[in-house]
Amino acid sequence: MERYVVTPHEGIGSLKLGMSPEEILAAVQNDVADLKIFSKRGIQISQTRERDANFQTLRYMEDIYFSMVRYQNGKAIEISVDRELRDEVKVSLYDLDVFHTPAEDVIRFMKQIGPCIHDEPDEQLSTEYEFPALGIRFWRERAFHEKLLLDRAYVEAMQLVLEEEKRYLYFDIVTVRP
């Protein structure tokens, strides 16, 4: 497998909206085998309990592979994959590598296709970006933008971890929903 394709309103790779947990697990197992990711533990699955019993969220983990699927009434309604895959497989949306392309460039490109909602007043320093018309959401743990380097107080305060902060120029997770 060379590429994990993100398809709006449909899915990511072989993980498709509308699949049951059993179908998703089979798809994850096939993808992990195709990626030649093996560990002694096998695929680990963890569940998040939700207040509404009609919903559940399952996380599928195997070494560098991590996906999260939210289900409603036993059918996938949201599928996410994590950036840890980026060195093994290209995760692409409209041929754009979503984990190797700076977040600012991803958002600029996606805004040509559909409107964007972000979680902070300063779009460049947001951590979550949603494109409702496309059923696509991007997330990063923290925001970082080169303009922060113009703030002397920020640079001094962040001196020890500044190189690490630059990883937040990129997204951590891409999600597909209906």
Language-model segments: residues:
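Amphipathic N-proximal alpha-helical interface segments
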Residues: 1-11, 32-98, 113-178
